């Protein structure tokens, strides 16, 4: 008797809808993914992360093989979200500097001349952990400030991990996650900071040249990038 395997689709509605219509979303195009991968490879500390095989588990499930991408090695952050953080922060910075991220590499963006121009930029985000770590780490790389808000109940080890990568401030709020996001976004709007969030809502779906910029549209591109041998 065959075993039934229960699984959960981790796709996004718009992606699935476009696939059904026979078209691939533009942000998943091979040429787009290649450009993002090229940028990531220019970041100091970049290295291909290991791909582990689980043949025994695959055999149990009647599969040919199972592969697990070990992202704990990514930029020394013990998390894959440094990819999203550095890409989003770099995109915002390139807009300010008038650079094209598809043509610029990390060293060009991070030159001493450019760092002087962006030294007063401030990024803010809300996080349960790894997303905030990625944003704080990326902002620090460029000599910018990063404020990270975390929901109530966050354990101290997660707070300290974000402090350790260079966050300007890590604040554990009195709110749960959704209200913590709202709180961070409000502070971004009040201060003219850049909100870098991995949660989307109405009015926050793509980049706009306003005081509180939206990032999710770019971050979607990274899903494909991490699937490649990177």
Regions found by a protein language model. Give the residues of each.
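PLP-dependent amino-acid enzyme catalytic core
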Residues: 1-230
């Amino acid at each position: 008797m065959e075993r039934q395997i229960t699984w959960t689709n981790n796709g996004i509605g718009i992606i699935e809808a476009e696939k059904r219509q026979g078209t691939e979303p533009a942000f998943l195009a091979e040429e787009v993914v290649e450009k993002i991968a090229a940028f990531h490879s220019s970041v100091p500390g970049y290295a291909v992360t290991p791909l582990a095989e689980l043949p025994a588990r695959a055999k149990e499930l009647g599969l040919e093989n199972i592969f697990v991408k070990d992202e704990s090695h990514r930029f020394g952050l013990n998390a894959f979200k440094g990819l999203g953080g550095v890409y989003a922060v770099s995109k915002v910075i390139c807009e300010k500097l008038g650079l094209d991220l598809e043509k610029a590499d990390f060293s060009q963006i991070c030159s001493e001349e450019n760092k002087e121009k962006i030294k007063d930029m401030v990024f803010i985000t809300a996080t349960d952990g790894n997303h905030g770590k990625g944003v704080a780490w990326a902002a620090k790389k460029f000599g910018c400030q990063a404020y990270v808000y975390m929901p109530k109940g966050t354990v101290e080890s997660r707070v300290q991990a974000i402090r350790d990568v260079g966050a300007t401030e890590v604040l554990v709020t009195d709110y749960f996650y959704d209200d913590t996001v709202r709180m961070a976004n409000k502070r971004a709007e009040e201060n003219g900071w850049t909100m870098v969030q991995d949660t989307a809502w109405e009015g926050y779906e793509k980049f706009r040249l306003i005081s509180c910029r939206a990032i999710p549209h770019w971050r979607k591109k990274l899903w494909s990038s991490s699937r490649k041998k990177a």
